[in-house]
UniProtKB/Swiss-Prot annotation:
GO annotation, biological process: DNA-templated transcription; regulation of DNA-templated transcription; symbiont-mediated perturbation of host apoptosis; symbiont-mediated perturbation of host ubiquitin-like protein modification; symbiont-mediated suppression of host innate immune response; symbiont-mediated suppression of host type I interferon-mediated signaling pathway
Encoding gene, per UniProt annotation: E6
Originating organism: Human papillomavirus 40
Protein name: Protein E6
Keyword match Transcription: yes
Subcellular location: Host cytoplasm; Host nucleus
Amino acid sequence: MSARCGSQARTLYELCDQCNITLPTLQIDCVFCKTVLKTAEVLAFAFRELYVVWRDDFPHAACPRCLDLHGKVNQYRNFRYAAYAPTVEEETGLTILQVRIRCCKCHKPLSPVEKTNHIVKKTQFFKLKDSWTGYCLHCWKKCMEKGQRSETLC
C-alpha cells in the first residue's frame, strides 16, 4: 500500500475505499506491538468503528490484545467518575441516545438498545477523561458471568 494512499482516511472502511482494496485483503500493523493484524482482527477493528492511527504517513490499527491492554490502562489512568444517564445528558446537553458512548471493554459504540439497558437496569456510565463509556450487551453478559457488579469497571 502506498504511503500516500488513503492518507486522509479515519476508518478502515475509508482507507479501503480510497486505496481501492477490500477489507479482508487489507494488511495493517498494530500501532503498539507492530504485528500484522489477521483478517478477523481487521474486521473486528472495523466493526468497532475505531479510528486509524497515522504514523510516518502509514496507517495503523490495534490488535485485540493491545486494544484490551491499553483500554485497561486508559481506565485506570483516566477514570473520573460514574454517573447515571440524567447526569450524562445534563453534562453533554444531549439526550443519552445522541451521546457517543463506547463500550469500556471492547470499545465499540453503544447502540440505543445498549444505552437503554443501562437506564432500565439503573446502571451508571463511566467518565474517562473527556469521553463516556458503558457496556455493550456482549461485554455486559461477560462481566456479569464473572460475578462483577455492573456499577464498576470490570
